[in-house]
A protein has these predicted regions:
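Cytochrome P450
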Residues: 1-188
């Protein structure tokens, strides 16, 4: 997966390198996570942007009230319907992706009966993974780039010492969490 992630990053970033100005969040930060998650899950490449748009709208909130944005509910329904269609395809024609693995997963319930995950369970999980995973990663990318643009010495240190990247990501997640509308409780 790492090789595919690197190739996807290069595919999205290479066209931007010769340009004097570009919107890194719109042209990379928002697209990259869905490309990776979409490939892992098994979304057709041509449908990933559409799913991302539905997800963005489904998760969007009014910053003043916290209420869902207009069209958010409908977008969430479209996203789930899309996932359900892919799941039905994978049950008929399995492929090498997470959707197929979940479609074929068996487990033993408390009565000892072997069961499969229900469509609702698979659709719910994949929709959550696609929406929440892409949103938080996109926001992390944006937050990190803004922070590092304001801290040139730190940016240079990370550039010079790439082994610090995992630690820097963890610290950026802690310092400027991508999910701002979730309550958190500090504990000892």
């Amino acid at each position: 997966l790492e090789a595919e992630m690197r190739a996807t990053a290069c595919r999205l970033l290479d066209p931007l390198m010769d340009r004097e100005h570009f919107d890194i969040q719109a042209e990379f930060g928002k697209k990259y996570p869905m490309e990776i998650i979409g490939a892992l899950v098994g979304f057709p490449e041509e449908s990933r942007e559409m799913f991302r748009e539905w997800s963005d709208l489904a998760l969007s909130r009014d910053p003043d009230t916290g209420q869902q944005a207009p069209g958010a509910l409908e977008a969430g329904v479209k996203a789930r319907d899309f996932v359900r269609e892919i799941l039905e395809e994978r049950r008929r024609a399995p492929q090498d992706d997470l959707m197929t693995i979940l479609a074929q997963t068996e487990y033993e319930d408390t009565d000892g009966q072997t069961k499969h995950l229900t469509d609702a369970e698979v659709v719910g999980f994949i929709t959550l993974l696609g929406q929440a995973g892409a949103e938080t990663t996109a926001k992390l990318i944006g937050n990190a780039l803004v922070y590092l643009s304001r801290e040139p010495l730190l940016r240079q240190r990370i550039w010079d010492e790439p082994h610090l990247i995992p630690q820097a990501i963890e610290e950026l997640l802690r310092f400027d969490a991508p999910s701002q509308f979730q309550g958190r409780t500090a504990g000892r």
